[in-house]
Amino acid sequence: MKRNVLLLPLLIFLLIAAALLWQLARNAQGDDPTNLESALTGKPVPAFRLESLETPGQYYQAEVLTQGKPVLLNVWATWCPTCRAEHQYLNRLAAQGIRVVGLNYKDDRAKAVAWLKELGNPYALSLSDSDGMLGLDLGVYGAPETFLIDGRGIIRYRHAGDLNARVWESELKPLWDRYSREAAQ
């Protein structure tokens, strides 16, 4: 009896270790947790009322994302090192006429405004989600994340991680072109 009690912690440890190794092997084979599809894909952007990041007291609602043309909703924060890495590419997309709306997520307003002044502002509009409620409604679990929203306000794609040239060309641009054509008809 005493021996069985002593073996129980070892057995539990071995089971946990096996489960961890199994998950690591899955990730190595391409089961990337950042590729999880959003539960909101194919559904309208959740209703919201958020303050402008740069103009305190000015509020926007979800309709700002439903202006007949596609838009990228980029979730970012100054505390996010990957957001800094993707920022230059977002500036390039904006310079090409891609409409990007920024959602500053759980961040300090003054730091965020200073960040945009320092690194450039790719956002046609910057919204402040200081309490993270819209992020929660969108299923955001970190920053950066980027959502492609069609001209009717339907979420068509979610990308977790930095938006770079490879991701844009292979994943987002084909969808952007498709929904841009649909909006033009």
From Swiss-Prot:
UniProt-recorded Gene Ontology molecular function terms: disulfide oxidoreductase activity
Gene3D superfamilies: Glutaredoxin
One GO-annotated biological process of the protein: cytochrome complex assembly
Domain of life: Bacteria
UniProt topological domain (Cytoplasmic) ranges: 1-4
Periplasmic face residues: 26-185
Record family assignment: Belongs to the thioredoxin family. DsbE subfamily.
Role summary: Involved in disulfide bond formation. Catalyzes a late, reductive step in the assembly of periplasmic c-type cytochromes, probably the reduction of disulfide bonds of the apocytochrome c to allow covalent linkage with the heme. Possible subunit of a heme lyase.
Listed name of the protein: Thiol:disulfide interchange protein DsbE
